[in-house]
Amino acid sequence: PSYSIGPDCYKEIPHVTRFFGKTAAVIGGKTAMAKAKKAMIDGVAGSDVKLLDFIEYGGDSTYENGDALIANPTVRDADMIFAVGGGRACDTGKYVADKLDKPLFTFPTVASNCASVTAISVIYNPDGSFREYYYPKLANHCFINSAVIADSPEQLLWAGIGDALSKEYEAVFSSKDDTLSHTPLMGKQISRICTDPLIEYGAEALESIREKKASFALDQVTLDIIISTGIVSNMMSTVDSYYYNSTLAHCVYYGSTVTEH
């Protein structure tokens, strides 16, 4: 995936998007957009890029919410889709952009998952239970604003560290009995580097987020959670050929969506 990281990375929006259009519909979570809005507006100030509107995505990555956005005239008229927020907001944005065949740019506001750079969307039913996977195209670029990440809830970074820690073990275990072709083999090998940065920098990254301060350690953990695991996901899953991206950790999570708790 193509990405930028840093406290001023939104200033790269005009340059990165220059070949894709001049107008963008921003869709995402209410809190996420509130935290990112000023930096996004400042990032495109003085450029040809116009942010048409900031539209709430509906709160969950369902086909119903995605289809409502697809029917929104502002979304339909925009040259580009900007998806802002956590995994479900990004997954919804991927579905919308794919169905409308528009360029997609993601703006993760939490480091809890790799959805902003993966070619898979987790789709839920309206009652919150897991429905299925949808396989969209990749986002054209991911903007990771480290100042916005530093202002996110500590428990979401903690969850992201746990999610990323499972990547190596799931990838290696689920593919252990198969002869892998080039792409999943590369994904398996990349999964082996997902663990060490979390162990080395995880505690310091959590301290940074408690203090609401960007840091080298927080950047390393953020990149591990979003980019490294995202690369593994893209290389180890396809629509119909193979799926080495999940074992017990994902099964427990998806099972929890259909139980009362």
PLM regions: where:
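Active-site nucleophile and cofactor-binding loops and adjacent substrate-binding regions
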Residues: G58, V84-G86, Y244-S246
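Short glycine/serine/threonine-rich phosphate/pyrophosphate-binding segments
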Residues: Y10, M33-K37, Y63, R88-Y95, ...
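ATP/NTP phosphate-donor binding region
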Residues: P1-M80
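Fold-independent oxyanion-binding glycine-rich loops
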Residues: P7, G29-K30, V84-G86, F107-V110, ...
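Active-site segments that bind and position negatively charged phosphate/pyrophosphate groups
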Residues: S181-H261
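A short, small-residue-rich loop immediately preceding and capping a beta-strand
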Residues: P73-V96, L100-V110
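A glycine/threonine-rich phosphate-anchoring loop and its flanking beta-alpha core
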Residues: K99-S191
